Every structure is written in structure tokens, then in C-alpha cells.
Amino acid sequence: MNRREFSTSFLLGLSAVAISANAVAQASRGSAGAASKLPTVKARNIVLVHGLFADGSSWSEVIPRLQAKGLNVTSVQNPLTTLPEAVDACRRVLDRQDGPTVLVGHSFSGMIVTEAGVHPNVSALVYVAARAPDAGEDYTALAKKYPTPPASKGVVFDGDEGRLTEEAFVRDFAGDLPRERALALYAVQEPFKKALLTGKTTNAAWRQKPSFYAVSTEDRTIDPDLERFMAKRMNAQTIELRSSHVSLISHPVEITDLILRAAG
């Protein structure tokens, strides 16, 4: 596989063992609908998980707004090595919470939220332009039903580490930010390991927990219609923002409000 093919496959996503479409549809009609009707538990803890091409500081516009509401906020430093290691890092933070917790994921970390979100401390889930696979779902096959996102052409590898080029980061990842701000974020971009792409999800926490989703209508990293499909499938309370992939930075007020809604 050449670099471009691998890059495209990456952004379309890799996960879990394939299961039948009928099984997915039946399960989604069942427990996902039930989860959406669960009452939202009052939570004072918020755990934020960043995606690829970023680090925990990507939540810097949201964190102070949540703290101003008296919430206890933790931003997980995702190791970006393997999915199990990333999930373990998230679980360790969840273990430290003293009660109901809203778990929030951006982009690729929707995989982490979906897997770790079954933790007993998690009261609700928030997906910000994020992947939301079903348990055992072939995310690649699902994503291939939608147009290939433009950012896929900008993923490059140095050995087993991948990252976005400066041009792709500014144009396709953070396209609605001032160039200076986008370049500052590019400077702290964390590389990811190829092994991260082979991870398999075994849980679908959105089947069990109330879920919320922020669709980015101008997203060039995950197709917006794929985001809409995943949000609808989990019967999430959904908002749409005229935003690039990084709505947590370009639309922090709206993202904060969605998290507060999930917190009850």
C-alpha cells in the first residue's frame, strides 16, 4: 500500500471486526433508542479527550468556560500509540472522578469515548465531530460510503509516525481559524503511531448512555454527512455548527453549551 492509500484508509478509519448490517441495524433500533431516553444525571465532572493531530491543549477554549460554571475539568493527554493504551489513559482519569462524569471526545477520540464510556462514572457522552462506531463495526466500510475527506491527502508518515502537513492542517483541519492560530496549533501537533489504526472497539457506550453530538457542516476531515449518520443512529441530541473540524476551538461557546446540557 502506498502512502496516499494508507493515508486515505486512515481518515476513513480502522476499527473492529466486521458484523452483519442486520445485526447493527437491529441493535441500533433497540438499545440506542433506549439510551437516548435515559434521564440525564447531574454531573460536576467533565473529562475531555483530544483526537489526532492535537494534544490536550486543543480544549483550551472550552476548559475555562466549563470551570467558570464550577465544574471539575480534566483534559486527557492521549498517548496516540495504540487504541488500548489510549483507552487505558482515559479510564485512569475516569477512575479518579468522584461521581457522575460527562465524557467528551473530538475526532478520532470518539473511538476512545465509545470504548471507555461504559465506565460506571460516565453519565453522558458528547461527540464533537467525532467517530462513533458501533461495537465490532468496520468503520472503514462505513466511511467508504461517503466522500473521501480532503485532509486525507495531507497525512504523511515518517517511519511509523503520522501527521498532517502544514498546508492540510491549516486548510482542511482548522480551516475556519485565523492562519496564525492554526499555525500555532500545528506547531504542537502530536504524531500518531500506525499501530493506533489497528485498534478494535468492543463496546458501544452510546447504546447505554445519553449521547450528544456536534456536527461540523464544513468539515474536511470527516464527512459531515457521515457525522449526521452517526448522530442519528445513536439518537443523539444534535447541534450543527458552520465549522471546520475544530469546532471546539472556533465555536467554544456552542460546544461548552452542549457539554453543559449533557451535564444536566
Residue ranges and their predicted role:
Residues 67, 72-102, 116-119, 139-144:
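Active-site loop/oxyanion-hole signature of alpha/beta-hydrolase fold enzymes
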Residues 1, 20-42:
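C-terminal segment of N-terminal export signals and the immediately downstream linker at the start
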Residues 122, 126-159, 193:
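Flexible "cap/lid" loop of the alpha/beta hydrolase fold
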Residues 43-83:
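Conserved HGGG/HGGXW glycine-rich cap/lid loop of the alpha/beta-hydrolase fold
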Residues 249-261:
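Post-His helix in hydrolase/transferase enzymes
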Residues 193-234, 239-243, 248:
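Conserved serine/cysteine hydrolase catalytic core
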Residues 105, 109, 113:
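Gly/Ala-rich beta-loop-alpha elbow adjacent to hydrolase catalytic centers
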Residues 5-26:
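N-terminal export signals
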